[in-house]
Amino acid sequence: MSDALINGLAGAGGGIIAQLLTYPLQTVNTRQQTERDLKREKRKLGTIEHMCQVVKQEGWERLYGGLAPSLAGTAASQGVYYYFYQVFRNRAEATALARKKKGLGDGSVGMFASLLVAAFAGSVNVLMTNPIWVIVTRMQTHRKMTKDQTAAPESPSSNAEALVAVEPRPYGTFNTIREVYDEAGITGFWKGVIPTLIMVSNPSMQFMLYETMLTKLKKKRALKGSNNVTALETFLLGAVAKLGATVTTYPLLVVKSRLQAKQVTTGDKRQQYKGTLDAILKMIRYEGLYGFYKGMSTKIVQSVLAAAVLFMIKEELVKGAKLLLSNATSS
């Protein structure tokens, strides 16, 4: 079994577990990002308050809205990403060794090369899995109709604040697929792909930071006669790497969520986005810079925890798989 396949499967497994543990936070964060309160008069709910409100008004199950396609998307995304990451990484390492033989470089993959490797893998992943995340975003932001919400809204702003989906229950995966297709055709499944492609810099930064810190840690251990990195150390390295990447690219994530969520159908043009640039300009004009950082504290907690768990489990799965393969080969 190739290293690329081992890393792909391990990444998928780690991603699923991380997703299960942090999904309620992800749902709350997506809802926070897609709030369209232009006047900003209301006090914003904290993460725990928002979560309790969802449970009280809509039930526990809404915290896990879109979980099934999300798990499929996580497995696909992590599998595709890690597979192509390892493929491109192997080529980069081979190129570095070839350059060393010619007297150029020390044979190691530099920071810039690591960034390119992660960017290429991320771009392939985005183009292949974007339709899944459009569906997940729709399901996370869909809200159950209450008796008060079934009446006609008093104003466009109240409709926008609620972001109430008009489809009847149940609102499952196939309902969502039909809604997206009816609204924008096949291209609707690639809404938000431009900011998402730009956001490739997030995992690129994440893996660049992670690989750099991991390499330095291993070198320090090698000087002491050991090359082992503990699960806790991997957890902490993953958390630090994700924190740096998330803070840098968060505004693009908000734009992506706005584009992928169900568009407000009122006559208020301020809340209807024609594309990425239109969304950015309207958010700047009507919400200010604040609009680009809605729910950021929730996202930091969710993404850092998920990334730390993912890295820890992925590395342990890779170690276990290689150990099993080596034992099978020796026997």
Curated annotation (Swiss-Prot):
Main localisation: membrane
Q: What does the UniProt keyword field contain?
A: Antiport, Glyoxysome, Membrane, Peroxisome, Repeat, Transmembrane, Transmembrane helix, Transport
Q: What happens when the gene is disrupted?
A: No germination or growth inhibition, but delayed storage oil mobilization. Decreased sensitivity to 4-(2,4-dichlorophenoxy)butanoic acid (2,4-DB), a precursor converted in vivo by beta-oxidation into the herbicide 2,4-dichlorophenoxyacetic acid (2,4-D). Enlarged peroxisomes.
Q: Which InterPro entries does its entry note?
A: Mitochondrial_sb/sol_carrier, Mt_carrier_dom_sf, SLC25A32-like
Where are its TM segments located?
Answer: 5-25, 63-85, 116-136, 180-200, 235-255, 293-313
Regulation of its function? Inhibited by pyridoxal 5'-phosphate, bathophenanthroline, tannic acid, mersalyl, mercuric chloride and bromocresol purple.
Q: Please indicate if the UniProt record lists Membrane as a keyword.
A: yes
Tell me its family: Belongs to the mitochondrial carrier (TC 2.A.29) family.
**How is this protein organized at the quaternary level?**
Homodimer.
Protein name as annotated: Peroxisomal nicotinamide adenine dinucleotide carrier
Lineage of the species this protein comes from = Eukaryota, Viridiplantae, Streptophyta, Embryophyta, Tracheophyta
